Amino acid sequence: MASNSHNNYNTPRRQNYDVPKAWEEDSLYENIDFLTQPAVSSDTSEDEEPLLSVARRVEVQGVNPGLKPRGLVRPRQDADNPSSDEGFDWELWKLHLSTRAFSFLEPPRLSSSNTASGLRSSCSDFTILGSSGVNPTSHANLSEEEMYEEIPPLASNPSDERHPRQLSGAVAQGAIRKSPRKLKFKPAKFKGLSSSLLNPFTASDSGRRARRQTPTCQPGFTPIFQDLGEPHYVKACTVFFEGCMAAGKTTLLNFARQTLSDDEALTIPEPMRFWTEVYTNVLSQIVKINKECKPGKTSTTAELVSCQLKFATPLKTQSLFLQRSVKKDSEMQPVGPLDKWVIVDRHQLSALVVFPLVLMRRGMLSFSDFFNLLGMFEAHPGEVIALMSVNVEENFTRLKKRGRVCERHIDRDYIKEIKGSFNAAYCAWLFLQYFSIQTTMQICMGLSSLDEACATEGVCHTTASRIWNNRMLVTLSDIISQFSNDYTVQNVCYNFFSQLSTLKFVVIDLSAFRHDVPGAWGEFYMQVMKNGDIKTRVMDFTAIKALADTAHNTHLRSISFSSSQVFSTMLFLILLCVTGAQAITTPAPPRPATTTPRRGVTSAPLIVPASSSELIVTLDGTFHSVTIDMTEIRQYVRQEIIEALWNASHVFESLETTYNRYKDVYRFTDQSIRVNTRGSCQLVKK
């Protein structure tokens, strides 16, 4: 139960988990729909007492004073637990009620189609008022007229017969009030059962419009758990790029992927497909929460915890996969120029520590939920965090320039808070480099002061206080101050400090490399090489390459196709296959250089190697791969193929974005066709 103190760290979420309020008796019946709730079965005694108490209260208050006492009650028909001899052929959607006053002691009258004469029930499916302890089998010899009461006829109003009344009662302070909205879609749902309860999952609301599902392009399934053969162990440095959105992480990762070969570096992009297409779109949920939800609500903090867990799930699994690929009993060594690189976009530090800290400071995440997320943080030896940052104005300009829908709610203040939270996490790690985990725990628990710790460890008090006051450790100390004697709280704090101290940080200011990506990579490379604490691990490079290839294929193919895009792509592939077949069967002579190219296409020949090549077609910023056999094409490719490439590139939008991001849009192994934003093609030697 929730605490009654003014600092309530664990408020129950009644809106989400439906926690009953036992001290408010009337609230148990506020939203009860008596027409759809099944009658209480005769074998339950705990649930009958509150219902009978309400019934007595309503009868005493005179809700139905004219109702004569009855000797018998109609047999109950429990839709959830039907008797064995019932035929499951009730027509529940035909609800005919009498026009007289509503009573809790009299259930609604349902017309049954079991028999021609009327109702049919087993002898144990009824109860006699005032004699609940009598064995029901003793009334088996009663006639049907003595056993059942006579049902009065319905109203003679034709409109009532065509449209039977469907009342929905609810108890509020001893009175009955109608809630017609409860049954707005109930008859349609009952009618969808087709008078059968055997398949309740086929019910559908005919009044509601079904949501349109956009078809998505599902990438080919490449299992990363398959046997990849003999492992290939090499020394590799594992680096995780972190920082605010649009700080330059993905740009630097793509530069490393394009510049370095697969034998030198492997890159793993953000798991964007898992965040946007698997089960739910967590980016859209975050936007909705920031627009609609208010700080301080328990439902808001519950939704944010769900979102942060989804952000953290793929990041944790990637880190665990890399840890499993480390060779057992291998020692870490300092990084060298000939070592390999494993570069990952995002670490679980951002999903479980940094962004929850931002949300908690904004009042949207409770202290309890922030502390629970903090306890899930995990790091491994050898992991390096490359913290990248730019100034706020440059970061905001980049963010608005790329124009993502999920980032429209981000303003300058939000960017400042994210940068401050990353700086706070870095300062917490830096504090652990000066002080031991035990000393940090004593300061957070209030068992020791910062002055005593500085005197014991021999650290300058000015430096230590400046790092300590950077809000991360101060905030954590304030959160656990009232519960510092709890052993679970102590274990969570100790585990967080030990995991955080395992990491290694390098900070890169990209403000000086605005249009110089190679310079930014050089700055990152030199900082890693000069840091003697950064170590390499002996890792299975074959398994990591399989993970990287799968991650890139999933990242590049996660796109929703429209009908025009699918049609244009199919038309282009058919044209390409036809022209390629013509070139194979009847090779055309080379065109003269004086031939005027159509649509701005150059007529320079394209030399294709005799081996197979991969044609990469860009669809709105992503790649779609098609393998074409070029064995028989020796010297020239017909001009129509180049024109088809040019025409296909203009079918889709964001060509300028694609060109700036990937540069080489279409390529044949070692020679490529570059499509620029002015609408012309040129052959480029790679």
Curated annotation (Swiss-Prot):
Transmembrane segments: none annotated. It catalyses: thymidine + ATP = dTMP + ADP + H(+). Residues 1-21, 64-85 are annotated as: Disordered. Its EC number is 2.7.1.21. ATP binds at residues 243-250, 398. InterPro entries: Herpes_TK (IPR001889), Herpes_TK_C (IPR013672), P-loop_NTPase (IPR027417). Keywords: ATP-binding, DNA synthesis, Early protein, Kinase, Nucleotide-binding, Transferase. GO terms for biological process: DNA biosynthetic process; TMP biosynthetic process. It is an enzyme of class 2 (transferase). The active site is at 270 (proton acceptor). Pfam families: Herpes_glycop_H, Herpes_TK, Herpes_TK_C. GO terms for molecular function: ATP binding; thymidine kinase activity. Substrate binds at residues 308, 404. Residues 1-14 have a biased composition (Polar residues). HAMAP family: HSV_KITH. Catalyzes the transfer of the gamma-phospho group of ATP to thymidine to generate dTMP in the salvage pathway of pyrimidine synthesis. The dTMP serves as a substrate for DNA polymerase during viral DNA replication. Allows the virus to be reactivated and to grow in non-proliferative cells lacking a high concentration of phosphorylated nucleic acid precursors. Homodimer. Belongs to the herpesviridae thymidine kinase family. This is Thymidine kinase. The gene is TK.
